[in-house]
From Swiss-Prot:
<dbReference type="InterPro" id="IPR012131">
    <property type="entry name" value="Hstdl_DH"/>
</dbReference>
<keyword id="KW-0862">Zinc</keyword>
<feature type="binding site">
    <location>
        <position position="211"/>
    </location>
    <ligand>
        <name>NAD(+)</name>
    </ligand>
</feature>
<feature type="binding site">
    <location>
        <position position="414"/>
    </location>
    <ligand>
        <name>substrate</name>
    </ligand>
</feature>
<dbReference type="GO" id="GO:0005829">
    <property type="term" value="C:cytosol"/>
</dbReference>
<keyword id="KW-0560">Oxidoreductase</keyword>
<feature type="active site" description="Proton acceptor">
    <location>
        <position position="327"/>
    </location>
</feature>
<feature type="binding site">
    <location>
        <position position="360"/>
    </location>
    <ligand>
        <name>substrate</name>
    </ligand>
</feature>
<feature type="binding site">
    <location>
        <position position="419"/>
    </location>
    <ligand>
        <name>Zn(2+)</name>
    </ligand>
</feature>
<dbReference type="GO" id="GO:0000105">
    <property type="term" value="P:L-histidine biosynthetic process"/>
</dbReference>
<keyword id="KW-0479">Metal-binding</keyword>
<dbReference type="InterPro" id="IPR022695">
    <property type="entry name" value="Histidinol_DH_monofunct"/>
</dbReference>
<feature type="binding site">
    <location>
        <position position="262"/>
    </location>
    <ligand>
        <name>Zn(2+)</name>
    </ligand>
</feature>
<dbReference type="InterPro" id="IPR016161">
    <property type="entry name" value="Ald_DH/histidinol_DH"/>
</dbReference>
<dbReference type="GO" id="GO:0008270">
    <property type="term" value="F:zinc ion binding"/>
</dbReference>
<protein>
    <recommendedName>
        <fullName>Histidinol dehydrogenase</fullName>
        <ecNumber>1.1.1.23</ecNumber>
    </recommendedName>
</protein>
<comment type="similarity">
    <text>Belongs to the histidinol dehydrogenase family.</text>
</comment>
């Protein structure tokens, strides 16, 4: 199905409607699973030697020193333009502002007289950031991960990226307070962060995107007692746009294409009650596509994408909630009026002047978002992902005495005698003191 094919949602059967919202399969092949398992074993048992061998094999790079030196980082920064450095600083300022505002106030309440309950927040002690390499270095992801890690107060923040690491990534890491940077990529980097090596420290939690091998490595280490926690499940990028008759077709097309150029497995969907707008957007997509350097990639993504015509905006919202997109762009008049009805989306962009690119880079929100329908249960990355909550309770003698019979009754009902005894012994001790 080509992207210029308009689909009337209400002419489709329920089965056809479900098929229209089905995402491409992303399950790892048995081959990838086995390869990753072998990599994890080798890195865990052989440490730095295995990391160097994998760099030579997969990255075609002979790595002597795994850790990037301060001199190398300074030299990388010197090679960048002032314009780019200023743009990074501006983005970081907005990211800091938004994520600092997410700081949770402590909870301190007396649930009944003499029973004090608190909730306090502590940072995850050590985190590892994985940043992919390639022709287009994702230095913006460094800003999105390292900034909240710093605000949260994580004691150790380390970064791994395939060698040779781009100057932009090195400078962004320094700008955001990353303490150590390592020339390690792929599944072997995830293994090093999860298990540690002679050079790479073991961390408590791993963040960052990657290819199928990196994704599978994160999955495997997250399920091991000796591994590490991960940020969230990963899948191909996606955007859904809701547009009305007042939308600008060129704007809508540019937003769809900015997602499609991410990769051939990206998915884009347009929902509109106006068939004329849908046709104009399709025409604008073709015009803009011809000028894109990554047109081939975008065209592959568009082959699995949809132009859907609905009866009204309310139906657009209902379909969007059913799909649960990573990015939701609402290019309608009075776009904010629809926000309260949105129940599942990673990040929402309102109006003509809020392109996805703003959130990807510099508005301040985080661009690490749940994909593949995980918006139904997962949130966009934020300060809380670099923190953990801990509860504290303190009962006075009077508070304990007032609550004792309740606890004893509940423990007895669950037939947990030791639980009941822990209370009864104290009750008897208080009676003896009286």
């Amino acid at each position: 199905m080509s992207f210029n094919t308009l689909i009337d949602w209400n002419s489709c059967s329920p089965e056809q409607q479900r098929a229209l919202l089905t995402r491409p399969a992303i399950s790892a092949s048995d081959s990838i699973t086995r390869t990753v398992s072998d990599i994890l074993y080798n890195v865990k048992t052989r440490g730095d030697d295995a990391l160097r061998e994998y760099s030579a094999k997969f990255d075609k790079t002979e790595v002597t020193a795994l850790r990037v030196t301060p001199e190398e980082i300074a030299a990388a920064g010197a090679r960048l333009s002032d314009e780019l450095k200023q743009a990074m600083a501006a983005a970081v300022k907005n990211i800091e502002t938004f994520h600092s505002a997410q700081t949770l106030p402590p909870v301190d309440v007396e649930t009944q007289p003499g029973v004090r309950c608190q909730q306090v927040t502590r940072p995850v002690a050590s985190v590892g950031l994985y940043i992919p390499g390639g022709s287009a270095p994702l230095f913006s992801t460094v800003l999105m991960l390292a900034t909240p890690a710093r605000i949260a107060g994580c004691q150790k923040v380390v970064l791994c990226s395939p060698p040779p690491i781009a100057d932009e990534i090195l400078y962004a890491a320094q700008l955001c307070g990353v303490q150590e940077i390592f020339n390690v990529g792929g599944a072997q980097a995830i293994a090093a962060l999860a298990f540690g090596s002679e050079s790479v420290p073991k961390v408590d939690k791993i963040f960052g995107p990657g290819n199928a091998f990196v994704t599978e490595a994160k999955r495997q280490v997250s399920q091991r007692l000796d591994g590490a926690a991960i940020d969230m499940p990963a899948g191909p990028s996606e955007v859904l746009v809701i547009a009305d008759s007042g939308a600008t077709p060129d704007f809508v097309a540019s937003d769809l294409l900015s997602q499609a150029e991410h990769g051939p497995d990206s998915q884009v969907i347009l929902l509109t009650p106006d068939a004329d707008i849908a046709r104009k957007v399709a025409e604008a997509v073709e015009r803009q596509l011809a000028e894109l350097p990554r047109a081939g990639t975008a065209r592959q993504a568009l082959s699995a994408s949809r132009l859907i015509v609905t009866k009204d905006l309310a139906q657009c919202v209902a379909i969007s909630n059913q799909y649960g997109p990573e990015h939701l762009i609402i290019q309608t008049r009075n776009a904010r009026d629809l926000v309260d009805a949105i129940t599942s989306a990673g990040s929402v962009f309102l109006g003509d002047w809020s392109p996805e690119s703003a959130g990807d880079y510099a508005s301040g929100t985080n661009h690490v978002l749940p994909t593949y329908g995980y918006t139904a249960t997962c949130s966009s990355l934020g300060l809380a992902d670099f923190q953990k909550r801990m509860t504290v309770q303190e009962l006075s003698k009077a508070g304990f005495s007032a609550l004792a019979s309740t606890i004893e009754t509940l423990a007895a009902a669950e037939r947990l005698t030791a639980h009941k005894n822990a209370v009864t012994l104290r009750v008897n001790a208080l009676k003896e003191q009286a």
